């Protein structure tokens, strides 16, 4: 509201000043061509000027009065501008974010509603996880079968990935899956601004975080926050239920294979072949993520604490991890999603494979 008022006042002042100058120019030009005569009579620098009585009388008073009025305007207007400009900028920024979120929502919509069908695969406009039909090619036999590929929840994607990593995934997709490239650079249909608005919408649907640090005003993306305790307790309950039902032997195994959010919280989604379409092979044998079996994690991470830190933080492009690993940004960080105990239990299970 303040931003709109400030803008209106600025336009009003601009209009008044412009009108004044235009009027002055018009009258001056019109007066200059009224009559023809000798240079002595018409040249501006040869005309008789006002006498002292007139100059030091009403005319001087009028000019000084105008000067005082202009000075008052400057004295008031500049401080007001200084006070109101931050609010105007904040309002403009918020308006831009709201506009981008609205545009991004249109892109996220189903195809039937004019979007690119992100919501159709990922579980609605809140992206809680869903499924996508996919023709799966068997590289050995050449046969094709129709499967339902688990499309992960996206309402926690910024818990695990940075904005740059999310943008990369959107641009290039996951070409072995139903997720196609969406950015022009990757061969998709979206330009940079469309990707920016799509990311803005995805940020707006993140689960609000708890325990954000001082000065971190946005609970949707605050760096030091974590998944609400209620949701973390729900993950514990699901793991306990799976163990009690005999589906898994340990909580670590249950957490590794957690199906909640279409695998958005699990490890098996990337590290177990076939898990994403409901036909899992050997647990942890490797798919999009590398093979975790045969003690390979113990070779990569001689120190268990290093492996815990890696799972919490994920990999960063070009940075070293473990013994001889170099990050690509593909490994997400789970430190803001899972509790310390949950990560510890997963590590103990994985190191036993």
Give residue spans per PLM region.
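Sequence context surrounding c-type heme c attachment/ligation sites in exported
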Residues: 102-119, 253-268, 278-285, 302, ...
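Electrostatic cytochrome c docking/interface patches
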Residues: 84-113, 129, 219-263
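Membrane-proximal soluble helical/coiled-coil segments
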Residues: 84-175
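Surface-exposed intrinsically disordered loops and tails
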Residues: 125-146, 212-245, 257-258, 274-288, ...
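N-terminal export/targeting leaders of redox proteins
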Residues: 1-98, 207, 214, 218-226
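Extracytoplasmic electron-transfer domains, predominantly the class I c-type cytochrome c fold
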Residues: 135-205, 278-353
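Short sequence/structural segments immediately N-terminal
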Residues: 56-65, 69, 89-95, 101, ...
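Short pre-active-site segment immediately N-terminal to redox-active cysteine/selenocysteine motifs
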Residues: 111-120, 125, 150, 178, ...
């Amino acid at each position: 509201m303040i931003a709109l008022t400030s803008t209106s006042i600025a336009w009003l002042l601009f209009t008044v000043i412009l009108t004044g100058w235009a009027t002055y120019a018009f009258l001056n030009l019109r007066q200059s061509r009224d009559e023809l005569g000798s240079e002595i009579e018409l040249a501006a620098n040869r005309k008789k000027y006002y006498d002292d009585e007139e100059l030091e009388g009403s005319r001087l008073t009028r000019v000084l009065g105008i000067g005082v009025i202009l000075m008052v305007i400057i004295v008031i207007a500049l401080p007001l501008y200084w006070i109101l400009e931050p609010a105007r900028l904040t309002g403009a920024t918020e308006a831009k974010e709201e506009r981008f979120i609205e545009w991004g929502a249109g892109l996220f919509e189903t195809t039937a509603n004019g979007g690119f069908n992100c919501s159709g695969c990922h579980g609605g406009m809140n992206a809680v996880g869903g499924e996508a039909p996919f023709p799966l090619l068997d590289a050995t036999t050449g046969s094709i079968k129709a499967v339902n590929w688990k499309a992960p929840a996206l309402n926690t994607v910024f818990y695990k990935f940075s904005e740059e990593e999310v943008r990369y995934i959107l641009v290039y997709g996951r070409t072995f899956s139903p997720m196609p490239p969406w950015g022009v650079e990757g061969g998709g249909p979206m330009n940079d601004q469309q990707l920016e608005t799509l990311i803005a919408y995805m940020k707006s649907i993140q689960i609000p975080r708890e325990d954000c640090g001082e000065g971190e005003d946005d609970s949707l993306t605050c760096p030091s926050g974590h998944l609400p305790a209620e949701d973390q307790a729900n993950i514990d309950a699901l793991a306990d239920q799976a163990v009690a039902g005999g589906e898994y032997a340990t909580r670590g195994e249950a957490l590794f294979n957690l199906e909640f959010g279409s695998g958005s919280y699990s490890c098996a989604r990337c590290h177990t072949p076939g898990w994403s379409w409901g036909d899992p092979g050997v647990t942890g044998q490797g798919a999009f993520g590398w093979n975790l079996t045969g003690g390979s994690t113990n070779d990569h991470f001689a120190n268990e604490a290093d492996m815990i830190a890696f799972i919490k933080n994920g990999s960063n492009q070009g940075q070293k991890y473990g013994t001889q690993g170099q990050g690509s940004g593909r490994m997400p960080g789970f430190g803001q999603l899972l509790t310390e105990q949950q990560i510890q239990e997963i590590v103990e299970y994985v190191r036993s494979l």
